[in-house]
């Protein structure tokens, strides 16, 4: 009985980390589900409201590496609690924001905490789970991301529709405060594995496989968020869905991420290259078919299942590759670069989507993202896989 109790306690830090992933992912994409509401309340266009996503992502992209280098010697539990506290304060500021730029400033505070969080979350998941459970640890925190899409983002949208988007942000602040207390109680002290100097960065960037991981991550995020950042108005205005059906479709999209998480834990290690190819090619195809599928609600939902599942699976697989190919004393730095570049892609995708909406048509966001996805898939097959094979042959 005591053994089972001790075994359960070993998983509590991962549970706390997964809850934290839930709120961090919920808030990053909260404006997607509330885009129309925020734009109307602040008297700005939907494209300008979409910049709340872009700027958030660009701040993460710019600040991930410098903030992580500064914090690289800090004890990890203390670091985790500090960034969660900043996250809570920033959400309260968002709820009280009087205008567009005040809201943008509070989002920048969230983005700075996010920049460090996603640099340390995957390595922490690997370090806190029992030996041999690496894939399960990574897939568990990915489940937190999926639940954010299933419950967090749609619930935030529902709250926003009925009582206002400000209450949504305040609710996240309250939930995150409880998560802070849980992590304070259960998380062990974990010392950093050494300070990383900026002088070591060139050697890290000479790793061709790691560079390929980073490039594919930027391309994927840009392609994905060109379409996904404007999925809410697309579903309402192009697919002709009612507000309730839009919410349901967002839930389906997020819920499919759990399928991606399960598929990673089941199939990834058996054939990593095949898994990676599927997770690059399938979302690309979904983007290209988005407009064609919009003629039917069920076709759109089916497409969202495949798209959502493969997007999550891609993210976990490339987090694993970052940790796998980065030097042991630089896994957090490798993840900070991955997170920064992925968020650069998110910002670029939201920006490209905004350009398409403003200068072409909302209906064309899938085609724009799909073209970028084709470039990503070609690079993956032509350059990344050969470099990956050479690297693994030398290990």
Regions inferred by a protein language model and the residue ranges of each:
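Conserved MFS/SLC helix-loop-helix module at the cytosolic interface between two early adjacent transmembrane helices
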Residues: 62-98
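A late C-terminal transmembrane helix in Major Facilitator Superfamily
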Residues: 325-361, 369
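Paired small-residue
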Residues: 86, 90-93, 101-109, 298-306
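Helix-breaking motifs and short loop linkers at transmembrane-helix boundaries and internal kinks
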Residues: 43, 75, 96-102, 240, ...
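Helix-to-loop junctions at the C-terminal end of transmembrane segments
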Residues: 63-75, 260-272, 357
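Cytoplasmic helix-loop-helix junction between adjacent transmembrane helices
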Residues: 106-144
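Helix-loop-helix hairpin linking two adjacent transmembrane segments in secondary transporters
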Residues: 102, 130-187, 230, 234
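Intracellular juxtamembrane helix-capping segments at the cytosolic ends
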Residues: 117-129, 313-327
